[in-house]
Regions:
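Conserved phosphate-binding/catalytic region of the ribokinase-like
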Residues: 2-6, 183-286
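A short helix->loop->beta-strand "cap" motif at the edges of active sites that frequently abuts
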Residues: 43-44, 143-147, 192-196
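Short, acidic/turn-prone active-site loops that include or flank metal/cofactor-
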Residues: 31-32, 101-102, 152-157, 175-179, ...
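Conserved N-terminal subdomain of the carbohydrate kinase-like
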Residues: 16-21, 25, 44-124
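Positively charged, low-complexity intrinsically disordered leader regions
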Residues: 1-23
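Conserved beta-alpha-beta core of the PfkB/ribokinase-like small-molecule kinase fold
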Residues: 124-188, 204-205
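Histidine-anchored nucleotide/phosphate-binding helix
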Residues: 31-40
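Residues at the starts of beta-strands that form the adenosine-phosphate
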Residues: 7, 44-47, 71, 146-147, ...
Length: 286
C-alpha cells in the first residue's frame, strides 16, 4: 500500500551479512536496505541499481529483491564473488568481522552513461554511500541536476568530506561525541554544500541541521531489541521518504523536518525488532 508519494533509487552496495553465531545469512548493504525499508515504509516506487556477482549469495540477494518488488532493471551481474560481510551479535548489537570489500563490485568502477542518468532522473533522489564505490560518479550526477543522499561513515576523514560533500544534497553520518562536538561537525559538513545534514547517535537520538537551526530527535526506546543491524539505514530511509512526501504536500520545510524525524525514530525502533537488516534470513554452511 502506497503511503508516501516518494520515488527512491539506491545506487551502489549489496552484500550478504553472514551471522557467524547462528549460521544464518541475510540480505543487506546500505542501498539494498534503503530499498527494502522504503517498500516496508510504503513509498510509490523503489529501485536498486548496482553490480551483483555470479555466485549463490548473489542469487540469494536478487531473489529477495524480486520478492519485495524492487526494480532491478539497471543492475548488472558480473562474473565473480558477490559482496559479503561476516558479523555476530552481542546483546543485540552488531559486531562486524571480516569482509571481502564488495567482491567483484569493489573491483569494477561504475561509469554512468546518458541513459543511466535519464533513468535516475525519474526518482526524487538517489541514495549512495562511502562503501558503495560510487564516489567517481557523484559529480556526474550533481551536474545532471540529481539530488543525492549520501551516507558517510564514522571514520570518514575531513579530506573525504571536503572532496565529496559538495556534491551531496542530503548528508547522513553517525557520530560518537557530545552535543557541542556534534553541532560543530554538522556545521562543518553543511558549510561544504549539503542542504540538510543529519547525525545519528544510537540511543542518544539524532541531531539535524539545515543551516538555520538544529533539530533534535530522541531515540524511540524499546524493550525487545533483537538486532540493531540497519538501525541507521532505516532512520535515514524513513526520514527521506517522509520528508520528500511532506514537501510535495506543500508542508513548510521546518515542519516537514520535524514530522519526518518523528516518523524515522519510530520506524528505526521497529527495525531493531527484526533479525538481520530487514529479515529474509537463510541458513548457510561454512
Amino acid at each position: 500500500m502506497v503511503k508516501y508519494n516518494t520515488k527512491v533509487l539506491g545506487f551502489g552496495d549489496n552484500v550478504v551479512d553472514l551471522y557467524e553465531h547462528s549460521h544464518m545469512m541475510y540480505p543487506g548493504g546500505n542501498c539494498v536496505n534503503l530499498c527494502a525499508y522504503s517498500k516496508m515504509f510504503g513509498v510509490e516506487r523503489a529501485a536498486y541499481m548496482g553490480y551483483f556477482g555470479s555466485d549463490d549469495i548473489a542469487e540469494f540477494v536478487i531473489s529477495v529483491l524480486n520478492e519485495l518488488g524492487i526494480e532491478t532493471v539497471k543492475c548488472k551481474q558480473l562474473v565473480g564473488e558477490n559482496g559479503w560481510s561476516k558479523c555476530t551479535l552481542r546483546d543485540g548489537d552488531r559486531i562486524f568481522g571480516d569482509y571481502n570489500e564488495g567482491g567483484v563490485r569493489g573491483k569494477t568502477p561504475y561509469i554512468l552513461d546518458r541513459f543511466d542518468l535519464e533513468y535516475i532522473k525519474e526518482f526524487d533522489f538517489v541514495h549512495t554511500g562511502n562503501y558503495c564505490y560510487t564516489e567517481s560518479q557523484l559529480k556526474v550526477m550533481k551536474e545532471a541536476g540529481i539530488k543525492i543522499s549520501f551516507d558517510f561513515s564514522d571514520d570518514s576523514s575531513k579530506e573525504y568530506y571536503e572532496k565529496y560533500a559538495p556534491y551531496i544534497t542530503y548528508a547522513f553520518c553517525s557520530f560518537d561525541g557530545d552535543d557541542e562536538a556534534a553541532k560543530e561537525h554538522l556545521k562543518f559538513i553543511h558549510s561544504l554544500g549539503p542542504e540538510l545534514v543529519s547525525l545519528t547517535r544510537g540511543s542518544k537520538g539524532c541531531i539535524m541541521y539545515d543551516g538555520e537551526q538544529f533539530y533534535t530527535q530522541p531515540a524511540t526506546l524499546i524493550d525487545n531489541v533483537v538486532d540493531t543491524m540497519g538501525a541507521g539505514d532505516s532512520f535515514l530511509t524513513s526520514f527521506m521518504d517522509c520528508y520528500i512526501d511532506q514537501l510535495k504536500r506543500g508542508t513548510d520545510r521546518q515542519e516537514a523536518i520535524r514530522t519526518s524525524l518523528k516518523e524515522a525514530s519510530k520506524f528505526a525502533a521497529h527495525v531493531c525488532t527484526l533479525n538481520g537488516a530487514f529479515g529474509y534470513g537463510k541458513p548457510y554452511e561454512d
